[in-house]
A protein has these predicted regions:
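N-terminal small-domain helix-loop-helix segment of the aminotransferase-like
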Residues: 1-53, 60, 110-111, 248-253, ...
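PLP-dependent enzyme catalytic core of the Aspartate aminotransferase-like
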Residues: 31, 42, 191-192, 304-305, ...
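Conserved PLP-anchoring active-site segment centered on the Schiff-base-forming lysine
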Residues: 64-83
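Active-site phosphate-binding strand-loop segment of PLP-dependent enzymes
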Residues: 95, 100-176
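Conserved core segment of the aminotransferase class I/II
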Residues: 119, 182-266, 270-276, 358-360, ...
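Helix C-cap/helix->beta junction micro-motif
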Residues: 156-157, 279, 319, 363
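Conserved glycine-rich beta-strand-loop-beta hairpin in the small C-terminal domain of fold type I
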Residues: 261-273, 283-298, 333
Length: 366
């Protein structure tokens, strides 16, 4: 099962593990999280709580921070899985922060206050704001000033800030990404810092969704303590931890992997965005992730949810391309679609773009 060069044997893997996670793996994970952020932030291994993926991490944090019928504010468009992860078992509500293309879907103070007031008017207690940075489905990062404003808002409202940074190692224009950890590093007030919690996973940056490895990193002692007590429901196997601790501790490998992965993502992103542009289709400027945010609003016969889904159905059945309609992400504008481009060959991408070009040519003839 394992080699003889210091790797753990079957017995060591099979016995009960530390529910907090193996120290070696938490140390390796902390170092890797620092590495993908360019060393701009420091992570304490003792503040890392392991979970079976980011899904479990987000749900666990929701259980800790909120009670049934409380709410989290989430900017739109957002990852459709949040409707499951944050709501199904916790009984917590999602109140959308409506963002639009007028400022590239960045969160504005007005939209934030409006969402908070909507919840208050409905007698719903708001317990926090949850963002994804970089964003899924936008493929864009949250500006530093927006992060600072978000934290100020959370302090004023006495609520929490959760930053899901699952794509933080897949930023192909690294200078554009600011982790909330960088904001916290410059804050001395513990009462402010302890409102911030980060979710991370190896599913996207290392392409290991089947390994089910996620983390909660909290600046709150109480949240760390509570998350550890509850983490027995979402443990990561000893074998997985040992293997990944060894892999992540190989700094030469991780540095090369991050560099090559970012370069490949950048090239792939530029290929698809340029290809779509030649077909007359514009995309939101992106800098991270495995997808682009494509605007087909000009093709809608009706500027409605049904109109968007009708176009999606045509693309699915005629072009045999499965893209995600913006309505599934609760987008406030109709006609936006998420296009995933990473998990396919160059040849497959070329075929997809060819079909899109032919589709657009047919549309122009009508």
């Amino acid at each position: 099962m394992w080699g003889s060069k210091g790797a753990p044997g079957f017995r060591e893997n099979a016995l009960f593990q530390d529910y907090h996670g193996l120290k070696t793996f938490r140390q390796a994970m902390a170092s890797f999280m620092e590495q993908i952020r360019g060393g701009k932030s420091r992570f304490d291994p003792d503040r890392i709580v392991l979970t079976a993926g980011a899904t479990a991490a987000n749900e666990l944090l929701t259980f800790i921070l909120a009670d049934p019928n409380d709410a989290l504010l989430v900017p739109t468009p957002y990852y459709p899985g949040f409707d499951r992860d944050l709501r199904w078992r916790t009984g917590v509500k999602i109140v959308p922060i409506h963002c639009d293309s007028s400022n590239n879907f960045q969160i504005t103070p007005e939209a934030l206050e409006s969402a908070y007031q909507t919840a208050r008017d409905a007698n719903i207690r708001v317990r926090g704001v949850l963002i994804t940075n970089p964003s899924n489905p936008l493929g864009a990062t949250v500006q530093k000033k927006v992060l600072e404003d978000l934290l100020d808002f959370c302090v004023r409202k006495n609520i929490h800030l959760v930053s899901d940074e699952i794509y933080s190692g897949s930023v192909f224009h690294a200078s554009e990404f600011t982790s909330v950890a960088e904001i916290v590093e410059n804050i001395d007030d513990v009462s402010v810092k302890e409102r911030v919690h980060i979710v991370y996973s190896l599913s996207k940056d290392l392409g290991l969704p089947g390994f089910r490895v996620g983390t909660i990193y909290s600046y709150s002692d109480n949240v760390v303590k509570t998350a550890r007590r509850m983490s027995s429901f979402t443990l990561v196997s000893s074998q997985t931890q040992h293997m990944l601790a060894s892999m992540l501790s190989d700094v030469e490998f991780t540095e090369n992997y991050i560099r090559i992965n970012r370069e490949r993502l950048r090239r792939r992103y530029e290929t698809i965005v340029e290809g779509l542009k030649k077909a007359g289709i514009e995309c939101l400027k992106g800098s991270a992730g495995l997808f682009c945010w494509m605007n087909l609003g000009f093709l809608l016969e009706k500027k409605t949810k049904d109109g968007e889904l009708q176009l999606w159905d045509v693309i699915l059945k005629e072009l045999k391309l499965n893209i995600s309609p913006g309505t599934s992400c609760h987008c406030s504008e109709f006609g936006w679609f998420r296009v995933c481009f990473a998990n396919m060959s160059e040849n497959t991408l070329e075929i997809a773009l060819k079909r899109i070009h032919e589709f657009m040519d047919r549309r122009r003839k009508f």
